[in-house]
Amino acid sequence: MEQGLLHLYWGDGKGKTTAAMGLALRALGSGKRVVIVQFLKGGNSGEIPLLAQLGAEIYRGKAGQKFVFQMTPEEKAATRELQNQNLAAAIAQPADLLILDEAGSAEELDMVDVDLLKKAVLERPAGCECVLTAHAPPQWLLDAADYSTEMKCHRHPYQKGIKARKGIEY
């Protein structure tokens, strides 16, 4: 059995989730079992139905559609509970590839139990490849990563007032 490595895609640039989902597609195309947790994301995103159709196990959502900074304490508690339930369910599944999208942001915003997240990452089965995305990852993730790729934004259409486009940004 090959050793599963830890990938970290992080920074303020576009492409972190895109890179992670591209790897999911590659793994599924190679017959691998893929489990994805999308922290703090709800709504429609074009890749999710296709990845599910191809066999990925996907856990996502939040309590409501607000950003965390807009949530009431009750909504934050419900969202945190949902994130922890999703992560616990995901790590109970057999996986060749585990993707934890926005895990760093979930930790930074106290929307996931850090001990559970560390267990998912640091105590995963030996052959399980793991991918995390984050804006500003905690030091323990930077230290643990086998691959650490920083996505840096130099220019983005949003800066010109161009909104996210279906099929491109989501």
Functional labels for PLM-detected ranges:
Residues 2-93:
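Conserved P-loop
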